[in-house]
């Protein structure tokens, strides 16, 4: 629950009775191990006098060989059964969305037996020369500068984004890619980002659990390789004031075992109705649980970045583009109840059937939206660069799964009352569109007008993390996690305590570092300079 990787190395060394040793290995060594659970963040679940915890192999994530060590991805639970990691709730959420989405897919294709959540992350970071980095106590201790002066040339010329990559940086990037490919991380894209010294990597999209693991491993690789090139990789969300910070866009979609992306429009009205079903239900989930999405991206570092004209605001909204908005507006105008055959045909041909044409030419990109539809996926843009993707993916898959369950129950009730399947789907979708309309926003998320409009719409604007963490322990959140079997009340409250404690400890470290720098670096130099000025004044007086 530190948000980073943890590892324990066990050798295959086994002494023998005759004083020699052999290498001994069997599968039982991989399945379960017993580390100390009290030494990790645990939110009070484990104490020093009751410290037992267990690791268990996660066979759904790839094992890999790092140097000469076989690495087994594992979950981590307390002796009493509570999850003490980020992987366990993620796996539970992925299982829930699999079942819920598969059930809804039965309305359209009975060959669908499994639905996978996909994730493609975009990792932003800064590279700083090691000597310059180590000369700054604040960078060493906190990962960001606490004092400093803006350079004459920052990012005002807009010439760094996609610019020529410096040779030394490129050599570091190539080795990071090489080491990543050796471990099965399919890194595909590299480029300069907006701020000087800022760069980005992005891989091929993959199954969410595997992709989350790969990102955690990738951040570790970046740090190690950067050091070999006399760089330091900065993953803090805002390492330097006055220029852009770093984020980690999470591109999310759902795909079936038959190879269909459920968030990609099809070539027929039937396939487009399936697309609309998952598209609209995702927006409804974001509307109903926007506060939890805000909590999922909260951190001390991300507080410096959200809403600062470089990242999405702290108000959770969804951008879908003007053309898809018009499609939803048409569906909203439907009369309730059964539709005539003529009306249904017109709807399928003139509204639902034209979606591929609309998306081909009219899907724009709104960089100010925290949750944007980009043609065949949703892009969750507010995740911090140093964060694990597990938090955001757990919440997103959980809320979508819960909404799909509600939607299916509503449709089944309408069908049981004698309504045809298509009529029931359209009626249920209309209800979702109306209920979630306020969370859709097409304008400038950086503007003050949006803050005023969001307040009128009843959307929360929570600019700081401590208050955002409170959304985890509301009665509604507790019920959501419990009824879907993702986290029980004890596990949820433990995470809340850990997040709050981590936030305050980071602020405390920054405060102490700032105090040390002022007392031992800034003030002595200022006094020395003051003394020099005084001496100069006295000498000038003597000359006069």
Annotated model-derived regions:
Residues 237-239:
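Short, well-ordered turn and helix-capping elements at secondary-structure junctions
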Residues 1-235, 244-250, 254-497:
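Glycine-rich, acidic/polar active-site loops that bind/position phosphate-bearing ligands
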Residues 500-544:
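Substrate-recognition/cap regions that form aromatic- and gly/pro-loop-enriched pockets
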